[in-house]
Amino acid sequence: MIGDEVPAVVIDIGSATCKAGIGGEEVPTAVLLSIAGRPKATSCSIGDDRKSIFIGDDIPKNRYRALFQLRHIIERGMITDWEAMEKLWREMYFNELRVLPQEHNCLLSEAPLTPKADREKMIEVIFDVFNVPNFYVANQGVLSLYASGRLTGIALDIGDGVCHSVPVYEGYSLNHTILRIDLAGKEITDCLVKLMKETGNSFSTSAEREIVRDMKEKTCFVALDFDQAKKEAEQSS
């Protein structure tokens, strides 16, 4: 049995990034891209490393990136590549947090309206592969309200793959009132790719799309005054 004095591992999975840390800490210890890269060639070695799959930040960001077929491990809030997801969790436990899974309980967030079959698969991997002693899956919207010190309210979660509106009452999500829309950060990336194409710049491969996503995250912002922001952009161009 794991005593209460041993802090739990907290894992937050998302379409763009997955975060992990130790319960009670202010910020996550690890933030990894939710991306898996598989070599386009039969075998591919980067330096002295030879793998069949690269995870998150292990994927090269230089010219070698084009050698990989990139795929998001989580799409629209749902895990679509369980092999890569297992490797990402392994990376978090052993290389980022540097803790043994069997010595810590685990709290893992999940997207609202996650299918029962997906949750069962998640539990199977956590218990059978990582031997975690105790495991709890929590709604991301509920956890967001907890983080703000509230038990009742509406959590609006805008991610990279999906947006959710989650009404919460006394710490419980009202599942029959949850709203979901598959319009999120990914669509902004798609829009930027289209705008780039109109100016003669093509970003068609998965690696090139990641370049556009990186540009979006570093340069785009929400304009509090749209007209003023548009005017300033026209003057600087």
Positions of PLM-derived features:
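Nucleotide/phosphate-binding catalytic cleft detector across ATP-hydrolyzing
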Residues: M1-S15, K19-A30, G37-R50, D57-V162, ...
